[in-house]
Amino acid sequence: MFYSLSVKNFILIDELEIEFNKGLCVITGETGAGKSILLDAILFCLGYKTSNNVIKHGKDYTVVNIIFSLNDEIKKFLIQNFIEPEELLLVKCLQKVEGRKNFFINNQIVTKTLMKQLANYLFELHGQNNNITLLEASTQRDILDSYGNLLEFRVQLAKCYQIWQNTRKEIEEITVKQNEIEQEIDYLSFVTEELTKLNIQIGEEETLTNIRKDLQNKGKNLQLIRDIIAEINNPEINISINRACKLLARQDYNDRFNAVVTSLEEAYNNLEVARQELSNILGSFTYEEYNLEETEERLFLIKAISRKYNVPANELGIFLDKSLEQLGILKNKIANSNKLQAQEVLLQEQYYKLASDLSAKRLIAAKHLEESLNQELKQLKMENANFKIEVKTRIDPTASGNDDIVFKASTNPGMKIEAINKIASGGELSRFMLALKTSLFDKMIKPSIIFDEIDVGIAGEAADKIGDRLKKLSSVTQVIVITHQPQVAGKADLHIKIEKTQLEQETKVKVKALNLAERQTELARMISGKTITAASLKVAKELLHPVAFSHDQK
């Protein structure tokens, strides 16, 4: 509920602060006194469209602060939007002459959209030009379902509808994309078969690259050994050594060349040893586990596959796993198609059974609400009004059921019953809403309800009845009423008066919460005009008698 309102430099207001009470709060004042300014300030603060020129003449900014009490629903909204709930809720709007509006919730800057979303949890507004929600089909449906205690049943229906629609969507996706799915299955089957067959291991490319490098080095060494052996095996070397030894043996000084002969013979023997050792080394190369050709073929294959699927060689195993997973999903989609179709039939039957039950309950609730509302309208002195609720089957099912709900009425005898937006004036719509709220009473009630001049065009007993209904409604929620009727104002728990004053070429608006004596004077003014008479004071006192009595008992 509204706890307090603080306004500064707003239109004709210099500065004011109002504290509100629970129950029924009325706002009165002479015609043109600026009663609507308070309402404009509230709408301005909560992000609704107001006049473009709201900053008081001569000032460079305006600011409006409203403090609300909290309930669990509001706390949940704040938490969902990352705003820390406090003991009370503070909302603020600041606008400078040269700038745009800035909105704050608990001193945290927010968007206008978020502020308006919050406002939906805080209050309702009904008046000459503010009954749009009553005209919306969704609101009319919610009113009927709330009256008939059908909201929980509707939640059950909505869950069934959602599952049904999700199943239908899945079937449609499979049907529309059947060829694509089958092509994808063929492709993934080929991919997974190829990669599984290749069995490429993590790190294999790097391992093979190192092996190839090693083999290439060994290949160079092998060729070198072969070249050396070829040189050693040259027969001319042996022939040359033998010939040298024979020549030395013929010399007269044979003894002097014995050492040379010995060296040549050792050279011959060493060549034989070297030849044998090199042959042994050469033979050992034939027992390597890998050969270069096989290694290069495997490396070429891995690189080709990597390029083919545009996947790093080291991630081909992951790519295979994902391909296998996707292949399984697509195969299951095809396999489950028939199951889904059977399931969709059952869900459709379940939905229409629930929707049919809801329609039947709505028809019963509609009849009872019609009777209740028509009685309330009579109490509000709309004896000629006739209210009807049309519940008709719609072509397309929805999460809210298979019905279109239309509130219809006629306000005068002989008039055709039509949708209420076509036949009712702003004031009549407000009284329709008051009658609905009274019929619903403790259902669909927000923390605060504002009625702006709901009693325009009525007086006497009708105004008294409206006051009674507003008073009754205020027992379950805070009700704020801008009124011209003393019968309504006399029932208030809090009476606020707005006055417009002219001082030195400047117009100002003054707001004051009245005490009991001041209320009597204000009611007398509302009864007789500017000239307050003894008779009007007496009537005012009688209107206030229940209030005065309740104050005396406190």
Curated annotation (Swiss-Prot):
GO terms for molecular function: ATP binding. SUPFAM superfamilies: P-loop containing nucleoside triphosphate hydrolases. Keywords: ATP-binding, DNA damage, DNA repair, Nucleotide-binding. The keyword GTP-binding does not apply. InterPro entries: DNA_recomb/repair_RecN, P-loop_NTPase, RecF/RecN/SMC_N. The keyword Protein transport does not apply. GO terms for biological process: DNA recombination; DNA repair; SOS response. ATP binds at residues 29-36. CDD domains: ABC_RecN. One of its GO terms (cellular component) is bacterial nucleoid. Belongs to the RecN family. May be involved in recombinational repair of damaged DNA. This is DNA repair protein RecN. It comes from Rickettsia typhi (strain ATCC VR-144 / Wilmington).
